[in-house]
Amino acid sequence: MKVVAFERQQQGTGASRRLRNAGKTTGIVYGGEAAPQKIELDHNALWHALKKEAFHASILDLEIAGQSQQVLLRDVQYHPFKQLVLHVDFQRVDAKKKLHTKVPLHFLNAEVSPAVKLSSAIVSHVTTEIEVECLPSALPEFLEVDLSKIEAGQSLHAKDIALPNGVALVAHVDAENPVVASATVPAGAVSDAAEGETPAA
């Protein structure tokens, strides 16, 4: 995904306010051997890009003054109550070095699972992203979590996620193995089932 930015000449709080009034958003690019670079971006284009999941979890081609560099979106600052992006941070990536970043989870097949079909359970998504490490070329836009076999009362953990070749959970996630989804039967559903039972003679 391509992002066009411009080198920022004006600095300071007053300058940032003037840029926002002109429909621009401030940002910074850091990392690698190059010095941090202050940039500005078109706010409306950035606002729409931020609505796309891939913009948050993909290697982006950031073009500044005709020169392109590969980056990851690392931070976004929003106005507390206006639909306004105040600032963005991008980190340069090295094609030969592994990176750590969070990848979105896409949950599939809950509706055909034993938990839902047999027990009328509710499958909850405990987290919507997981942190992985990989080379930039191996970074997936998302990871799929197959819920087709989950049963009532069961949970799926981070290590249950099928990872593509070259992608691994970061060390602390691998060690903690957190829950990513769980299936629970609502109390009302249990009561309904109990009421439907035939009393013993």
Swiss-Prot record:
Swiss-Prot/TrEMBL keywords: Ribonucleoprotein, Ribosomal protein, RNA-binding, rRNA-binding
Gene Ontology BP terms: translation
Top-level taxon of the source organism: Bacteria
Gene Ontology terms, MF aspect: 5S rRNA binding; structural constituent of ribosome
GO CC annotation terms, alphabetical: cytosolic large ribosomal subunit
Transmembrane segments: none
Keyword Cell inner membrane in annotation: no
HAMAP family tied to this protein: Ribosomal_bL25_CTC
Family listed: Belongs to the bacterial ribosomal protein bL25 family. CTC subfamily.
Record text on subunit structure and interactions: Part of the 50S ribosomal subunit; part of the 5S rRNA/L5/L18/L25 subcomplex. Contacts the 5S rRNA. Binds to the 5S rRNA independently of L5 and L18.
Function, in words: This is one of the proteins that binds to the 5S RNA in the ribosome where it forms part of the central protuberance.
The protein, known as: Large ribosomal subunit protein bL25
The organism of origin for this protein: Burkholderia vietnamiensis (strain G4 / LMG 22486)
